[in-house]
């Protein structure tokens, strides 16, 4: 990220600096509580902490993020989360548990009662892509699975979105395969557009964008669909078009001229192979 920040020029640099300082004025005085659905090994929380260190060095602004809520069904990944994320206050097994005010906390002994689910400023709404990935032989049969609330992808989004409707995090980020951009003649909206409408109905600004891995420093093509949703706390002051334009300018500014990492020096492994004790 330090390399990307160094490439910002002109008004984009000023806009970014202003945005970071504005965010810090609102939330920088106390720890930013974050959480994730479908956490895996929680690598996004580790990456987020690295970004905060860069912003501190660049702008002198101290952000402190506490990764307090995780959701993961696989037991070996639960063990990794417990070991590598000491800030965790609650670990649950399924997305459906996040729709309530209380849930069983896997960090505590089995005989403990349910605990209050912590409020989050930032929520990474992970949901499975298995119904719409091109690797699935049934992908073409699952177009609009999000709107139909079917399959792992449709049900996963439904359950994860319930957390938003119950707990109202300020910032929500989502990622899935680009198959959600497809639609058939009998539907007015693609699943991508449907997700945007779901957030807008609850007074969030929501921007969908298709990003390619090679544009941001990767050495191989890997397109993914992302959404950023921000709770609208200043109704009428800023238009959705202005917010969208700002995000698109940021995304364009951060595009890399080539790979930033020499992957020949590293071994890429699946996160399921990571040992619990990894540093």
At which residue positions do the language-model features occur?
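Conserved active-site and SAM-binding loop architecture
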Residues: 1-279
């Amino acid at each position: 990220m330090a390399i990307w920040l160094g490439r910002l020029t002109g008004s984009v640099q000023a806009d970014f600096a202003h945005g970071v300082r504005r965010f810090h004025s609102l939330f920088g005085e106390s720890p930013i509580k974050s959480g994730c659905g479908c956490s895996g090994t929680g690598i996004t929380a580790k990456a987020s902490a690295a970004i905060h260190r860069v912003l501190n060095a660049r702008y002198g602004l101290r952000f402190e993020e506490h990764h307090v809520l995780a959701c993961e069904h696989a037991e070996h990944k639960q063990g990794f989360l417990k070991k590598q994320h000491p800030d965790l206050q609650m670990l649950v097994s399924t997305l459906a548990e996040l729709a309530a005010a209380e849930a069983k906390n896997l960090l505590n002994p089995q005989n403990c009662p349910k605990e209050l689910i912590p409020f989050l400023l930032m929520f990474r709404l992970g949901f499975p892509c298995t119904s719409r990935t091109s690797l699935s032989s049934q992908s073409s049969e699952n177009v609009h699975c999000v709107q139909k609330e079917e399959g792992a992808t449709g049900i996963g989004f439904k359950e994860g979105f319930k957390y938003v409707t119950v707990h109202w995090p300020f910032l929500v980020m989502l990622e899935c395969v680009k198959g959600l951009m497809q639609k058939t003649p009998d539907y007015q909206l693609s699943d991508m557009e449907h997700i945007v409408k779901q957030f807008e109905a609850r007074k969030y600004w929501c921007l969908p964008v298709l990003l390619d891995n090679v544009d941001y420093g990767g050495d191989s093509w890997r397109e993914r669909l992302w959404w950023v949703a921000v709770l609208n706390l200043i109704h009428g002051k800023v238009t959705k078009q202005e917010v969208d334009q700002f995000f698109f300018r940021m995304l364009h500014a951060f595009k890399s001229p080539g790979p930033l990492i020499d992957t020949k020096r590293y071994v890429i492994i699946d996160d399921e192979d990571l040992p619990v004790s990894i540093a």
